[in-house]
Amino acid sequence: MSNPTVLDQIRHIIAQALDKPVETIHAEQSFRRDLGADSLDSVEIVMAIEDQFAVEFDEDSTAAVDTVQDLVTYIEAALASRGAQTA
């Protein structure tokens, strides 16, 4: 069995936080405009992602995230950077 992708894991976190079916969460969707997330939802999502991936967001990073794909890209870069630092 393969590991879930970063996108899959993030989709599940968002679906749980927003109480939506995971099938309705897509990479190109905007958190606020398309998914209806408010600032409290965003905090909940960020905290869950920080726990899941053992990464931390700074204020500038969270301000730059608009879509699900933006979040995936940020997490993948953080994981790659962490991997490069431990290699």
UniProtKB/Swiss-Prot annotation:
Presence of keyword Phosphoprotein: yes
Compartment(s): Cytoplasm
Originating species: Ralstonia nicotianae (strain ATCC BAA-1114 / GMI1000) (Ralstonia solanacearum)
Gene for this chain: acpP3
Residue list for modification O-(pantetheine 4'-phosphoryl)serine: S39
Keyword Lipoprotein: no
Post-translational modifications: 4'-phosphopantetheine is transferred from CoA to a specific serine of apo-ACP by AcpS. This modification is essential for activity because fatty acids are bound in thioester linkage to the sulfhydryl of the prosthetic group.
HAMAP family per record: Acyl_carrier (MF_01217)
Domain Carrier residues, every copy: 1-79
Protein function: Carrier of the growing fatty acid chain in fatty acid biosynthesis.
Name of protein: Acyl carrier protein 3
Keywords: Cytoplasm, Fatty acid biosynthesis, Fatty acid metabolism, Lipid biosynthesis, Lipid metabolism, Phosphopantetheine, Phosphoprotein, Plasmid
Gene Ontology, cellular component aspect: cytoplasm
PROSITE patterns registered for this protein in UniProt: CARRIER, PHOSPHOPANTETHEINE
Pathway terms, separated by semicolons: Lipid metabolism; fatty acid biosynthesis
InterPro entries, sorted: ACP (IPR003231), ACP-like_sf (IPR036736), PP-bd_ACP (IPR009081), Ppantetheine_attach_site (IPR006162)
Family from the record: Belongs to the acyl carrier protein (ACP) family.
Pfam family, one: PP-binding
GO molecular-function terms, A-Z: acyl binding; acyl carrier activity
